[in-house]
């Protein structure tokens, strides 16, 4: 059967989580932590020159090579077994362990999606600052190991913009604020093309919010088991956190009416099974505040997210700036905090308006600058924006014509994966 008649497979590999499913669906079929548990016990066996011992070690190595788990199964296995070590293939948006990444894809395709890779075209995502060599490695693994008929590697920011376009009827010109678990990127896109020289990234992302909440609760002396503290902080972030408009007023509200604003987390200790409770107070608004006042978390980076977005747009070509300010699209789970988009739009609008007023003052009122419209777009599929954008675009006929095929790979080599064309469905 012709692979183009089957739905393409869309896999969005993130630092924290991987989303995977079939083109045409609204939501991914599976969302798994991007982690691999590998049995490395054979490495600790004593080395010996005897043939029998070597054969034993070799057989153990082969068995261990096949004995691995991914996602939640990997996390559970590492807790229950001392022989399995965790490997995180992706760090800060970049693949660092290609062996673990190949194993991860293997399980995704055969164990979860349960499909034959030779029967489907594939769309994979990458970070905006990914080097071309990384695309070549991806192409080699997909074409040689899995023998896929076609592959398209898309920049996740373009897919997020496509998701905003589909749900909000916006242009394919805009700024994507992609806040993932391990990296935050601000990417300007003009008519489907990334303006590479203007990409900005900041070293604060979803995992940093979790670590900050964990630190706050630890300093307050909450009764949380050490081995469970990170997971509790992550769940507190996802369930209770919100973005406030004024941090001082928020402190006052919590102090005046603690019963109204302080929540209680109930958990079970992993080792003993005994129940425990802890209070969740200032963490609810201080967690997301690191994007707007980063100095409360780290002295190494103090530039706010609105200032980074403004700097990104100001470095773009002058004829695209108004369109970029008008379409700022949010993407990623860490943009899902309540009122995050509203706070971002307000703070960015202040920066832009202050520049306009300063410009008018410099000209003495002889030349008046036109107001700049600032619009931050939130949409229903914001959390899975990258995957949903890939699902929509890989459902179009133009997608199959734009993919790098197995025949092209065999003729020209992995270098064909260095670039992927923008196709008509993107704009």
Curated annotation (Swiss-Prot):
Molecular function in Gene Ontology: actin binding; ATP binding
Gene3D superfamilies linked to this entry: 3.30.420.40, Actin, Chain A, domain 4
Main location: cytoplasm
InterPro entries in alphabetical order: Actin, ATPase_NBD
One protein family per Pfam: Actin
Knockout mutant characteristics: Distorted trichomes and altered epidermal cell types.
Tissue: Expressed at low levels in roots, seedlings, leaves, stems, flowers, pollen, siliques and at a higher level in inflorescences.
Stored SMART domains: ACTIN
GO BP term, example: actin filament organization
Keywords: Actin-binding, ATP-binding, Cytoplasm, Cytoskeleton, Developmental protein, Nucleotide-binding
Localization terms from the record: Cytoplasm, Cytoskeleton
Domain of life (superkingdom): Eukaryota
Cellular component GO terms, alphabetical: Arp2/3 protein complex; cytoplasm
Function: Functions as ATP-binding component of the Arp2/3 complex which is involved in regulation of actin polymerization and together with an activating nucleation-promoting factor (NPF) mediates the formation of branched actin networks. Seems to contact the pointed end of the daughter actin filament. Arp2/3 complex plays a critical role in the control of cell morphogenesis via the modulation of cell polarity development. Involved in the control of cell morphogenesis in leaf epidermal pavement cells, root hairs, hypocotyls epidermal cells and trichomes, especially during rapid cell expansion.
Entry's family note: Belongs to the actin family. ARP3 subfamily.
Quaternary structure and partners: Component of the Arp2/3 complex composed of ARP2, ARP3, ARPC1/p41-ARC, ARPC2/p34-ARC, ARPC3/p21-ARC, ARPC4/p20-ARC and ARPC5/p16-ARC. Interacts directly with ARP2/WRM, ABI1, ABI2, ABI4, BRICK1 and SCAR3. Interacts with ARPC4.
Protein's recorded name: Actin-related protein 3
Native species: Arabidopsis thaliana
């Amino acid at each position: 059967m012709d692979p183009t008649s089957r739905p393409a497979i869309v896999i969005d590999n993130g630092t924290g989580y991987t989303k995977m499913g079939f083109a045409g669906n609204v939501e991914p079929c599976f969302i798994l932590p991007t982690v691999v548990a590998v049995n490395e016990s054979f490495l600790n066996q004593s080395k010996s020159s005897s043939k029998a011992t070597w054969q034993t070690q070799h057989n153990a190595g082969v068995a261990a090579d096949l004995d691995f788990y991914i996602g939640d199964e990997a996390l559970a296995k590492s807790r229950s077994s001392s022989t399995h070590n965790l490997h995180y293939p992706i760090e800060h948006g970049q693949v660092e362990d290609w062996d673990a990444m190949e194993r991860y894809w293997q399980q995704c395709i055969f164990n979860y999606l349960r499909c034959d890779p030779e029967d489907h075209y594939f769309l994979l995502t990458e970070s905006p600052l990914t080097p071309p060599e990384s695309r070549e490695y991806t192409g080699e693994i997909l074409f040689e190991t899995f023998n896929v008929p076609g592959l398209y590697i898309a920049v996740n920011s373009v897919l997020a913009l496509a998701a905003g376009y589909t749900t909000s009827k916006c242009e394919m010109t805009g700024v994507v604020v992609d806040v993932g678990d391990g990296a935050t990127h601000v990417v300007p896109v003009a008519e489907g093309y990334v303006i590479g020289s203007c990409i900005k990234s900041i070293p604060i992302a979803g995992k940093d919010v979790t670590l900050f909440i964990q630190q706050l609760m630890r300093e307050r002396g909450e009764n949380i088991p050490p081995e469970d503290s990170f997971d509790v902080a992550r769940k507190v972030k996802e369930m209770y956190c919100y973005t406030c408009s004024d941090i001082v007023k928020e402190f006052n509200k919590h102090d005046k009416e603690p019963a109204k604003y302080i929540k209680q987390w109930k958990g079970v200790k992993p080792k003993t099974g005994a129940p425990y409770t802890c209070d969740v107070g200032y963490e609810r608004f201080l967690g997301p505040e690191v994007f707007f006042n980063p100095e409360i978390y780290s002295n190494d980076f103090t530039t706010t997210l609105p200032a980074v977005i403004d700097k990104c747009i100001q470095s773009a070509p002058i004829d695209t700036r108004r369109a970029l300010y008008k379409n700022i699209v949010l993407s990623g789970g860490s943009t899902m905090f309540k009122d995050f988009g509203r706070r971002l739009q307000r703070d960015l609008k202040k920066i832009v308006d202050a520049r306009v007023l300063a410009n008018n003052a410099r000209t003495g009122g002889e030349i008046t600058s036109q107001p700049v419209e600032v619009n931050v777009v939130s949409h229903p599929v914001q959390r899975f924006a990258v995957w949903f954008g890939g699902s929509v675009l890989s459902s179009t006929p133009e997608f199959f014509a734009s993919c790098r095929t197995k025949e092209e790979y065999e003729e020209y080599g992995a270098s064909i994966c260095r670039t992927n064309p923008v196709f008509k469905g993107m704009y």
